[in-house]
């Protein structure tokens, strides 16, 4: 009799646990803001939208890469001594590592 009582208790607890898991698994995260009005983009109707810059930021060339020289296809150094100093520092750093 005791074994039958234990088996019924285990089955009952299993049934309750499975129902709880089934309810939890059915919860869905939705997108109510998009479904209601649609996504709000930049338009004349939405003046609070930040304006996009005309020319987006674009990083220029570093002095050490001499991009200006590369565009002109000529070896033009404004300050050759400074370039030699940079090359010496880079060579010394390479020796340290």
UniProtKB/Swiss-Prot annotation:
Signal peptide: 1-25
Keyword Transit peptide: no
Residue pairs linked by disulfide bridges in the UniProt entry: 42-49, 61-67
GO cellular component: apoplast
One GO BP: cell-cell signaling
UniProt keyword annotation of Lyase present: no
Keywords from the named record: Disulfide bond, Hormone, Secreted, Signal
Subcellular location: Secreted
Pfam families: RALF (PF05498)
Record-stated family: Belongs to the plant rapid alkalinization factor (RALF) family.
General function of this protein: Cell signaling peptide that may regulate plant stress, growth, and development. Mediates a rapid alkalinization of extracellular space by mediating a transient increase in the cytoplasmic Ca(2+) concentration leading to a calcium-dependent signaling events through a cell surface receptor and a concomitant activation of some intracellular mitogen-activated protein kinases.
Protein name from the UniProt record: Protein RALF-like 2
């Amino acid at each position: 009799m005791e074994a039958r009582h234990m088996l019924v208790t285990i089955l009952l607890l299993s049934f309750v646990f499975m129902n709880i898991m089934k309810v939890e698994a059915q919860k869905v995260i939705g997108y109510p803001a998009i479904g209601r009005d649609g996504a709000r983009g930049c338009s004349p109707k939405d003046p609070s939208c930040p304006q996009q810059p005309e020319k987006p930021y674009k990083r220029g060339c570093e002095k050490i890469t001499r991009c200006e020289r590369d565009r002109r296809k000529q070896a033009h150094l404004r300050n050759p001594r400074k370039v030699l100093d940079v090359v010496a520092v880079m060579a010394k750093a390479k020796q340290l590592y």
